[in-house]
């Protein structure tokens, strides 16, 4: 898995009046998309996550979308977002931020057990937080940077 870079006549030469953003995302004729992608044996490219959302736990790359796809299989979960949070031993560990469907309940042990049966050990979230709604931008995209701000260095809210 690597970062997807693209080039062609339809690609922007850079960001308008933002030289720092251009310098970090444009290299020659190539635009760094910020997408984590893989190619199969036939050359088809699959986007697996956003590069900036990946975190490293114990030296292993964890792509939150993979963990979120497992979490969405739990019938109690309406929405899920996984972020990396600091950990003294592993560098970072996963925190699953969940929104439950109305009238549902879910405990940490059930989530951990479910994930442990379907994911490599280092991908299983270290903890969960249940909140009312995930922060989103105007187009509906989950704002993981807001979740990171909310949960960095603070105790995870009690699970109800």
Write out the residue ranges for each language-model feature:
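Acidic/polar alpha-helix N-cap and adjacent early helical turns
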Residues: 149-160
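FAD-site-proximal beta/loop scaffold in flavoenzymes
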Residues: 29
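AMP-binding/adenylate-forming catalytic core of the ANL superfamily
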Residues: 3, 8-9, 13-17, 21-24, ...
């Amino acid at each position: 898995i690597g970062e997807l870079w693209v080039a062609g006549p339809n690609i922007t030469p850079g960001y308008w009046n933002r030289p720092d953003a251009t310098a970090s995302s444009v290299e020659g004729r190539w635009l760094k998309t910020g997408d984590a992608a893989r190619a199969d044996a036939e050359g088809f490219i699959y986007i697996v996550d956003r590069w900036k959302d990946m975190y490293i736990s114990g030296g292993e790359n964890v792509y939150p979308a993979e963990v979120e796809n497992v979490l969405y299989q739990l019938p109690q979960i309406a929405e899920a977002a996984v972020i990396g949070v600091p950990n003294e031993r592993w560098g970072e560990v996963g925190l699953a931020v969940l929104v439950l469907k109305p009238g549902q309940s879910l405990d940490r042990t059930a989530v951990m057990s479910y994930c442990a049966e379907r994911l490599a050990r280092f991908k299983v979230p270290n903890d969960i937080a249940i909140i009312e709604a995930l922060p989103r931008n105007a187009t509906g995209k989950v704002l993981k940077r807001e979740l990171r701000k909310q949960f960095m260095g603070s105790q995870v809210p009690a699970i109800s």
